[in-house]
Amino acid sequence: MEPIGTTASTGQKCPESGVWKVVGTPSTTAPIAKGNTMPPYAGKAVTWKLIQYA
């Protein structure tokens, strides 16, 4: 398992299923499954941080 706090950028494959939060402001959280492509937020490429396991 990847540790809580792992980061992934828009366009990368999600390294761990769980709840991911956008780093910065504005922010949001989203459940993203391992292997899915990390999505953009508000039309921009962002960095996501794992905050909770699925």
Region locations from a protein language model:
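A charge-rich, low-complexity, intrinsically flexible signal that marks solvent-exposed coils, linkers
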Residues: 1-54
